[in-house]
Amino acid sequence: MDKLVITGGKRIEGEITASGSKNSSLPIIAATLLSGSGTFTLHRIPDLQDITTFRQLFDHLGAETAFSHNTLTITTANVQSVLAPYELVKKMRASIYVLGPLLARFGHARVSLPGGCAFGPRPIDLHLMAMEKLGARITIETGFIDAVAEGGRLKGATIDFPVSSVGATGNALMAAVLAEGTTIIRNAAAEPEIEALCHFLQAMGADIRGTGTTELIIHGCDSLRHVEFSNIFDRIEAGTILAAAAITGGSVTIRGVIPSHMESVLQKFSDAGCRIETTDDTVILKSTGRLKATDITAEPFPAFPTDMQAQWMALMTQAEGTSEITDHVYHERFNHIPELNRLGAHIDIEGNRAVVHGPQALSGTKVMSTDLRASASLVLAGLVAEGTTEVLRVYHLDRGYERIETRLQNLGAEIKREKYSEFG
């Protein structure tokens, strides 16, 4: 098993190009199952464990994939199986994304109930509700979702989501593009990753109106074509790198971004005392002195993203004053707090709100990763902690960050990856 060993006290400074987005890559890859023609070529796909897991799932389904230098090619003509087995799905909740495409293309899908990050309940009820609205008969038995399209093809419908859900919106969208008739998705997630999925489906020939809004109108079609497509940048990775510069009193330039996708995060960095500059595809953060305590509330886009909540909490341990961090998306996403407190932070939990008392001098020790973004928060804390911090179980981190230790090394961090055994 791998761990990251970090010697704190080095400033993060320099220039870097943002990686491709994991959270848009996964639904885009899933959407290739909607077409049985030709070979898809997808650029700017991050080299992550979740991408590897998805490729293994596609191999099981009968697709052919190849990955090199962040370009993924996929041929789906020979896909025959509609079974996504537990052995693969348990590794990653996003495997549920194959439900909509398989059901839309073949009229049947059998997908194991998903696994993934270990914080709080993240039910798939909204995914199943959307499939049922489109005419699927859903049964759950022996740990599998069995979905069958009545009459062999899904039918357009109006889907009103009671709460915004990126995953359910993506699944409904992919199912609807091959459904007979018109589908309206209300209270759709408007995250940039859903917008990117819409653009990909439109390139394939789908008729989608309302891209980038909370109401999507989809006119179903009979078939879709293979395309070449470039993925968007990873706004969460970019935000994490900005936080690394801010927590160490450094400065960083990130190229290949879309600043409008990060407005809420950039505003909070500014509120916290950092100087932020942007161009069409670049964001620059410069530290200006002591950080100021700044409250955040994690909510659906365009608000502050829940996937940056843990990193912001680490940052606020070094800010002057008391900050409140509330998560309205995942109320129990606070597994990182005990580990941050082990490093010397002073953070209290009050329901779905955390109160961070800063600034606190952090001291390096061994800490345990519990999920993807919690891991990132511990790395950030390690960058500023006195002495050596060991972040264990970094396989969580590898699910969402492409060689983060190398990228941080290139910006001045003293960080390395080592093997270890949990049994001695």
From Swiss-Prot:
InterPro entries registered for this protein in UniProt: Enolpyruvate_Tfrase_dom (IPR001986), Enolpyruvate_Tfrase_sf (IPR036968), MurA_subfamily (IPR050068), RNA3'P_cycl/enolpyr_Trfase_a/b (IPR013792), UDP_GlcNAc_COvinyl_MurA (IPR005750)
Domain of life: Bacteria
GO MF annotations, alphabetized: UDP-N-acetylglucosamine 1-carboxyvinyltransferase activity
Modified residues (2-(S-cysteinyl)pyruvic acid O-phosphothioketal): C117
Active site: C117 (proton donor)
Class of the enzyme per the UniProt entry, highest EC level: transferase
The keyword Transferase is annotated on this UniProt entry: yes
GO biological process: cell division; cell wall organization; peptidoglycan biosynthetic process; regulation of cell shape; UDP-N-acetylgalactosamine biosynthetic process
Binding residues annotated for phosphoenolpyruvate, in chain numbering: K22, N23
GO CC list: cytoplasm
Amino acids binding UDP-N-acetyl-alpha-D-glucosamine: R93, R122, P123, I124, D125, L126, D307, V329
Localization terms from the record: Cytoplasm
SUPFAM superfamilies given in the database record: EPT/RTPC-like
Keyword annotations of the record: Cell cycle, Cell division, Cell shape, Cell wall biogenesis/degradation, Cytoplasm, Peptidoglycan synthesis, Pyruvate, Transferase
Main location: cytoplasm
Pathway: Cell wall biogenesis; peptidoglycan biosynthesis
Family according to the record: Belongs to the EPSP synthase family. MurA subfamily.
Function, in words: Cell wall formation. Adds enolpyruvyl to UDP-N-acetylglucosamine.
Protein's name in the database: UDP-N-acetylglucosamine 1-carboxyvinyltransferase
Gene designation per UniProt: murA
